[in-house]
Amino acid sequence: MVVKVGVAKLGNIAAGVMAELLLDERADREDMMTFMATSGTKLQKEDVDRVVSNLKAWQPDFAIVVSPNGVLEGPVGAREDLKAAGIPTIVITDDVTTKKEGWEALKASGFGYIIVKADAMIGARREFLDPVEMADYNGNLVKVLALTGAFRKLQLELDKVIDQVKAGKKGAELELPKLVLNSDNSTKGEFTNPYALAKARAAYEIAQAVAGVNVKGCFMTKEWTDYVPIVASAHEMMRAAANLCDQARELEKGCDGVIRKPHKKTGEIVSKVALISKPE
């Protein structure tokens, strides 16, 4: 059986950059296939509708809706539309736990969700953010989510759903993830060196704090001479977090302790630690 996984990318968060790639890192899995439709940078209704229409036409076994601020009208409408079409749906978004009404509604719904608290909004001010700065920020954030363990935890949750479909479950029978990724559960079981763990935890906490700084710079500060240093400082924080992740990775390499968990062609996950060894 080949499991069909649909991915709707609405706007951009770092988790969306890698969502489907994490499931098939060498493009050789034979048990699943993905189809991704994107609205690009936009979250307008017509853009969202185009994405959802393409996804429904493909008829996936389940869908993933990745977006910033997953309690906004566009992402909410997308998942409701997919649900109405009988497609089980998992929401992947940044930290919406502070948005009380929308967060409570999501928790009470039948949707799965993975909240990535460190997937912090960018410093989107014209006087500061150009295409190069945007790409640099996202590169640093992807590194943080990869090397702290957040991406692995996200990938494992999605693989659990794929395994359920392979076992014959479908529709409402699927148990969808309900997970809020923080510095505790993201880093758990990811490191053999305690100093590497400490650096990764620090990196996650810094990245998570970036969102609040960028909110201040983008929405709470009026004068451009005031908000430019604020958003610039947020990007420096993300760069510092990425540097801590590099340091953590190097510590793990130094003691030959990097944990690797590749997929086999069958979708089975195997693991290894020593560099010169075979995964089992």
From Swiss-Prot:
Biological or metabolic pathway of the protein: One-carbon metabolism; methanogenesis from CO(2); 5,10-methylene-5,6,7,8-tetrahydromethanopterin from 5,10-methenyl-5,6,7,8-tetrahydromethanopterin (coenzyme F420 route): step 1/1
Matching Pfam families: MTD
InterPro entries per UniProt: MTD, MTD_sf
UniProt-listed SUPFAM superfamilies: F420-dependent methylenetetrahydromethanopterin dehydrogenase (MTD) (SSF102324)
Assigned keywords, A-Z: Methanogenesis, One-carbon metabolism, Oxidoreductase
One GO process term, biological-process aspect: one-carbon metabolic process
Example GO molecular function: ferredoxin hydrogenase activity
Catalytic reaction equation(s): 5,10-methylenetetrahydromethanopterin + oxidized coenzyme F420-(gamma-L-Glu)(n) + 2 H(+) = 5,10-methenyl-5,6,7,8-tetrahydromethanopterin + reduced coenzyme F420-(gamma-L-Glu)(n)
EC code: 1.5.98.1
Entry's family note: Belongs to the MTD family.
Role of this protein: Catalyzes the reversible reduction of methenyl-H(4)MPT(+) to methylene-H(4)MPT.
Name by which UniProt lists this protein: F420-dependent methylenetetrahydromethanopterin dehydrogenase
UniProt source species: Methanocorpusculum labreanum (strain ATCC 43576 / DSM 4855 / Z)
